[in-house]
Amino acid sequence: MIRHLSVILISCLLVAASCSTKIISTNIYQEQKEDLDNIERRYEKLNPKNHFSLAFTDKKFNIVSLEMITDTLTRIYEFTVTEKRLADTLIKYDYDTAGIYYLIRKMQQTKVTWINSFDYYVNDQPQQLIILSIKPVTIRYIFSPPKYIALSYFRTAQSFDEKGRLLDSRRTKQVRKIKGQVFYKITDRICYTITDKYR
């Protein structure tokens, strides 16, 4: 009897945990929608001229990793946010210094750990998506690694199945994975997944 009760309790906890991650993910987006969408828009405006990504590498959001990407070379630097070398590096490589500092401040305030863009193709047409990761304090189970919510912003409306999973296209039921992860619908062009890694 006790064994059956334990099995039922564990099953209920697992179901509640899987449901709560979806609720937590969509709630975090809804609660911070304005800030998150602002970060995505700012990044989109800054990125085409000089491609880059930003990631915070410490828990207090004081150390930022700046990845500057060109056709031939990728430079990766790590700075404390207040360090003068950060501004000097941005100026040296002709980045919008004020714009990137604004983005860094917004990411700190919203607890966005990473932002980057990726190119992909659909029917031989180039597409782009922007992914940002958030580290909410609420998603943490006993004996489990920290969890991150990854949001992907597409330029156009996407297709989803009846479970809300991102599909390759309207004409197929094949689930599309990004970086090995299944993404779920928030809006027609914004999806989320829960991941152990922030990038």
Language-model-detected regions and their locations in the chain:
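Acidic/proline-rich low-complexity IDRs
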Residues: 4, 8, 12-13, 65, ...
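Generic hydrophobic secondary-structure signal
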Residues: 10, 36-39, 186, 190
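Hydrophobic alpha-helical segments and their boundary regions
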Residues: 6-7, 83, 100, 178
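Extracytoplasmic electrostatic interaction patches
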Residues: 91-93, 97-199
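Low-complexity, intrinsically disordered/propeptide-like segments
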Residues: 8, 12, 16-17, 49, ...
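Bacterial Sec-dependent N-terminal signal peptides
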Residues: 1-30
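N-terminal export/targeting and maturation segments
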Residues: 19-104
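General "foldedness" signal
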Residues: 15, 50-53, 57, 165, ...
